[in-house]
Swiss-Prot record:
Region (Disordered) residue spans: 1-20
Location, primary (coarse class): secreted
Cellular compartments per GO CC: extracellular region
Listed Gene3D superfamilies: Di-copper center containing domain from catechol oxidase (1.10.1280.10), Haemocyanin C-terminal domain (2.60.310.10)
Protein name: Hemocyanin 2-c chain
InterPro entries: Di-copper_centre_dom_sf, Haemocyanin_beta-sandwich, Haemocyanin_C_sf, Tyrosinase/Hemocyanin, Tyrosinase_Cu-bd
Keyword terms of this UniProt record: Copper, Disulfide bond, Glycoprotein, Metal-binding, Oxygen transport, Secreted, Transport
Cell location: Secreted, Extracellular space
Coiled-coil regions, chain positions: none
């Protein structure tokens, strides 16, 4: 019974040696568990085998939700599913998180080291968090971490991913937040998995790499930070104040969590499979995070930092994104004056996808700030320039036929200022 014990989700770097050993033993046991509640079954929730829209359907697709306003809810349930499974296998704490918004030069040792010294057996054991096995294809997961993940900006500055998360946290409309939040999260999948076919950058097999759980515990923590910010701002935080409340998806069970116990044996996630029942994580799922600080900033300090950021005129590139049937890196450039002068890099982001995914199209733009890029080119809003993009697969090959529509240029005046 998980309903009466408060679980604390700790930063992976603050786990004690005993907690690390306990988590590893629990994951090792979970990976050996071939029942409906075992590792293979949970990992399949995100991709293969496909169970949606229902297991008996003639044409099925992966159940994972991307490009939709219920992305945070679906993945919050998935963290609870994993947390409960680890606790059933002996772990007594909460699902740890890897704070990838902070500067870093390597993956956490907890997930990167191939072996560890087990204090119980006094033996060197294989680290179950370094990879997982995909029974359906007979492969272990692998990683090809890209150098772009490792950034160490100076004091008072943020990594590229942290900047994208800050823009998400700035939004006080849930659906605006969700778009920025989800695209920022995509980077970790692509940067950790790289071009490896069985791992974090391949939608079918995301969840078979145990680092997924730490990544999504942090993704969920960032949603919790936004919720705390909303409460501080006097805005809705345990509901959605946007289009999600007008759609049936808000009131329908998220799958496969809402399916019967043959697919989902976890009573807790099945009983909370409707999105509106997922917001209040503290009461409904009985967990809290060790810290809701963002890069060392408390909620009040973070709010002040966001106000500081908004106190300047800013310019953004706007992309109305949709699924393209595969994962991709999108790079975009500023074109000065004429079409041939287009080699001025302005930014990049990742789209996640697969042929087996649910179709999606955002109903609002994803924004990427280009103020500094324009400043460096001595350009201003209203000058003669436009934006151009290129899409690449994760092997670096051009996806010339991908149509993401022409990016727009969005000017946002400093907060409190007025334009004619």
């Amino acid at each position: 019974d998980f309903g009466h014990s408060k679980k604390i989700r700790k930063n992976v770097h603050s786990l004690t040696a005993e907690e690390q050993n306990s988590l590893r033993r629990a994951m090792d046991d979970l990976q050996d568990d071939k029942t409906r509640g075992g590792f293979q079954q949970i990992a399949a929730f995100h991709g293969e085998p496909k169970w949606c829209p229902r297991p008996e359907a003639e044409k099925k697709f992966a159940c994972c939700v991307h490009g939709m306003a219920v992305f945070p809810h679906w993945h919050r349930l998935l963290t609870v599913q994993g947390e409960n499974a680890l606790r059933k296998h002996g772990f007594t704490g909460g699902l740890p998180y890897w704070d990838w918004t902070r500067p870093m030069s390597a993956l956490p040792h907890f997930v990167a080291d191939p072996t560890y010294d087990d204090s119980v057996s006094s033996l060197e054991e294989d680290n179950p968090y370094s990879h997982g096995h995909i029974d359906s294809v007979g492969h272990d997961t692998t990683r090809a971490v890209r150098d772009d993940l490792y950034q160490s900006p100076g004091f008072g500055h943020y990594t590229d991913i942290a900047k994208q998360v800050l823009l998400a946290l700035e939004q006080d409309d849930f659906c605006d937040f969700e778009v920025q939040f989800e695209i920022a999260h995509n980077s970790i999948h692509a940067l950790v998995g790289g071009n490896e076919p069985y791992g974090m950058s391949t939608l079918e097999y995301f969840l078979y790499d145990p680092i997924f759980f730490l990544h999504h515990s942090n993704t969920d923590r960032l949603w919790a930070i936004w919720q705390a910010l909303q409460k501080y701002r006097g805005k809705p935080y345990n509901t959605a104040n946007c289009a999600i409340v007008r759609h049936d998806t808000y009131r329908k069970p998220l799958q496969p969590f809402g399916l019967d116990s043959v697919i989902n044996p976890d009573d807790e996630t099945r009983e909370h499979s409707v999105p509106r029942d997922v917001f209040n994580y503290k009461d409904d799922f009985n967990y809290e995070y060790e810290s809701l600080n963002f890069n060392g900033l408390s909620i009040a300090q973070l709010d002040r930092e966001l106000q500081r950021i908004k106190s300047h005129d800013r310019v953004f590139a706007g992309f109305l994104l949709h699924e393209i049937g595969q994962s991709a890196l999108v790079k975009f450039y500023v074109c000065k004056h004429h079409v041939s002068d287009c080699d001025h890099y302005a930014g990049e982001f990742y789209i996640l996808g697969d042929e087996a995914e649910m179709p999606f199209a955002y109903d609002r733009v994803y924004k990427y700030e280009i103020s500094q890029a324009l400043h460096d080119l001595d350009l201003h809003v209203g000058d003669n320039f436009h934006l151009k993009y290129e899409a690449f697969n994760l092997n670096g090959g051009s996806l010339g036929g991908v149509d993401l529509s022409q990016p727009s240029v969005i000017f946002e005046p400093a907060a409190g200022s007025h334009t004619a």
